[in-house]
Amino acid sequence: METQAIVRGVRLSCDKGRLVADLIRGKKVGLALDILTFTQKKAAGIIKKALESAIANAEHNDGADIDELRVTSIYVEQGATLKRFSARAKGRGNRISKPTAHIYVTVGN
């Protein structure tokens, strides 16, 4: 039995999110939460909230035992890019791109 949590449109580069997601893929949820708690990256806090949501979904909707849950799959996909403008000298301008990401976390036995 698998349960999923999805976080969309997070202001995070998908490459930076994938670095953290690779740390917890396949681990038990208790160990994964500990890893995320002590990982000093912005993505760790965001992925931790998504994992906690998936755990709560599994417990509430399926009546799953938290001690037996594992992170069966986690992946971070690229979302829409916010394009911004930065004024430069002599009437020019540069484009600033602010990437977003979608995070998918699945927990199961």
Curated annotation (Swiss-Prot):
A single cellular component GO annotation: cytosolic large ribosomal subunit
GO biological process, one term: translation
PROSITE patterns: RIBOSOMAL_L22
One Gene Ontology molecular-function label: structural constituent of ribosome
Keyword Ribonucleoprotein found: yes
SUPFAM superfamilies for this protein: Ribosomal protein L22
Matches recorded under Gene3D superfamilies: Ribosomal protein L22/L17
Keyword terms, alphabetized: Ribonucleoprotein, Ribosomal protein, RNA-binding, rRNA-binding
Family: Belongs to the universal ribosomal protein uL22 family.
Subunit structure: Part of the 50S ribosomal subunit.
Listed name of the protein: Large ribosomal subunit protein uL22
Species of origin: Leptothrix cholodnii (strain ATCC 51168 / LMG 8142 / SP-6) (Leptothrix discophora (strain SP-6))
Lineage: Bacteria, Pseudomonadati, Pseudomonadota, Betaproteobacteria, Burkholderiales
